[in-house]
Amino acid sequence: AHILNYFMVAVTLIVVSVPEGLPMSVTLSLALSMNRMLKTNNLVRKMHACETMGATTVICTDKTGTLTQNQMQVYQTNFYNLKEQKLGEDELSNLIKEGISTNSTAFLDFSEEKVKTLGNPTEAALLLWLNGQHQNYLELRENATILDQLTFSTERKYMATIVQSPLLGKKVLYVKGAPEIVLAKSNRVAINGTCKPVAECKAGIEKQLLDYQNQAMRTLGFAYQIIEDGKDETFFVEGRLHDTDLTYLGIV
């Protein structure tokens, strides 16, 4: 009789210690958490996974295609001599739009309502910026004659193309790549309506690059060289630029 009494007391304590509404409260709380996570595009298949996520402090995940869509766009341009950063029909605008169009391997697909990008996302973003400036990149690319080209590589961190330019009537060498690399290969900077030696502008450009990097922005530097008639020097030697006289245009 004493054993039965002890057993009944133990069962009573267990039942009383768990509030009647606790299971329902926990279930409702987890269900609301699932609903909130779903609104942020996080689908939870099992309810108790919400509790696990709530206790998580670090998540290791792939970025491209998971957290991002592998699509880029130009946030800001800083071509030093370009007024209001809008392209026109002047020589500088011609250099910029032809350089972006020809010194690239990306394409835009206009067959659907939403423009699709093909190729390198960074180069495609530049073409989208041109399109936003009402410039036909394909027409510019087809009208120019590409004479030689160094495609981009992660080792040298730049791309270069020599074209026979119908806009300028001369051969032009266009270079784009990591700003610090392109700047190091340039002899002057087109700024404030004139050209100044790189040494006079280097500190300001490096400060600007640091500001962009602190905002987690990817940056590109642009430069060009007009090749005078009769000058048949070899600018590409063993897959690298050689003996150039570049003018730095700015940063995107």
Label each PLM-derived region with a short phrase.
Residues A1-V252:
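Conserved cytosolic headpiece of P-type ATPases
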